[in-house]
Amino acid sequence: MIKPRTPPGVLELLPREQIAFQRMLDVIRRNYERFGFLPVETPVFELSDVLLTKSGGETERQVYFVQSTGTLANAAESGATRLPELALRFDLTVPLARYVAEYEHVLAFPFRRYQMQRVYRGERAQRGRFREFYQCDIDVIGKQTLSIRYDAEVLAVIHAVFSELGIGDFQVQLNNRKVLRGFLESQGVRDGDLQLAVLREVDKLDKRGVLDVRDTLIGQGFGIPAAQVENILTFVATRSTSHADALVRLDALIEDSGPEAHEMLRQGVAELREVLTLVNVLGVPEHAYRLNFSIARGLDYYTGTVYETSLINHPQIGSICSGGRYENLANHYTQSKLPGVGISIGLTRLFWQLRDAGVMDGIAESSVQAMVVLMDEATLDDALDIARCLRIGGINTEVQMEAKKVSKQFQYASRAGIRFVVLAGDDERARGVVAVKDLTREQQFEIPREELASTLQVELEQAKVM
């Protein structure tokens, strides 16, 4: 007999956990749609040459390739060594680039899409690292140009999503890569590749600490003078304390740089100022975001605004949502310039971390809201009719199909996390009522049959408010 077990690197949930996970998906989807984003799904596998056009190195080593047994056998016989034709997607960005390039002649721009699907990476199996996981992405794609105003709207989406998720106080850290690169120019770091390397080091400050990053930047690999490194580290330590303070700090940055301020720095500051102004108009409270000059995002394709979101009371979880602005999404697939801005929520890892931190305790019980007890075999038709009426009234209802002891049926409802248990014995039927036991409040009451669904609906709505 084979021992049942799941492969490493996957998150498999019990029903109550799956309900909580599904509700998080529903909240994210609902908020994406409220902001006018359209749903897109792409195949779980793509053509290898298309998927891997922009990748290499570590990414390619983590890709799962798809090969039929027949093709595999033929390749072995012929001695062919080329990559398999198909590969599983490792993120949602590359499939989006292919999708927009393929359908750009029929899409309406700016194209606003959301995508919530599983992706696959051959990560080394370890705690908190997954080989199969959900990503929940939004992107706004322009043709030739895209207004910086969309960057503010994306921040408003982040605020809406995490406010409704209700998993704790959060804060969006906001920056602009042009500000970082313009400041590096002012410190004599002018080579583009060196700038990107410095930004990658800055992005590791929280993990490695200031001393380690300082030593790296001064060391042989970078060779930046110590005085300039100190200026860089002082600069990236900048944090705003309020909306007004953020604007003051941006003004001070330009003033301190003087008339010789690099044009890229000026442009980045202007973009941040507009984003901050519009975020305020969009109703995002100032405690929900901060200017943070250390936020760089490790991915090199970000060119402007960048975001990182974290839970204030659970800093150990790290970033729960990140993204930014990029200049040309699909340059490997089309000659059209397709700038965009977007974010991604890695929901599988976030859910695992929240569960590990105890944040998910008690969030969800069951998607079944009521259970009808089967008193005896003679009352089956009546029990089914009660359940039918409840379902018509919008109540998720389960019926016990076997006339077990009533106490056993109650035990089942309690264990399954069902709130309402409905009973209709001979006496209740004669009086046209049903008995309802609220297992959450430990109360029992009678309701006229015709009012059953509406009464339970009111009780459930009140529970949402509480």
From Swiss-Prot:
InterPro entries: aa-tRNA-synth_II, aa-tRNA-synth_II/BPL/LPL, Anticodon-bd, Anticodon-bd_dom_sf, His-tRNA-ligase, HisRS-like_core, HisRS/HisZ, HisRS_anticodon. It is found in: Cytoplasm. Its EC number is 6.1.1.21. Its main location: cytoplasm. GO terms for molecular function: ATP binding; histidine-tRNA ligase activity. Disulfide bonds: none annotated. The keyword Metal-binding does not apply. SUPFAM superfamilies: Class II aaRS ABD-related (SSF52954), Class II aaRS and biotin synthetases (SSF55681). Keywords: Aminoacyl-tRNA synthetase, ATP-binding, Cytoplasm, Ligase, Nucleotide-binding, Protein biosynthesis. The keyword Hydrolase does not apply. HAMAP family: His_tRNA_synth (MF_00127). Homodimer. Belongs to the class-II aminoacyl-tRNA synthetase family. This is Histidine--tRNA ligase. The gene is hisS.
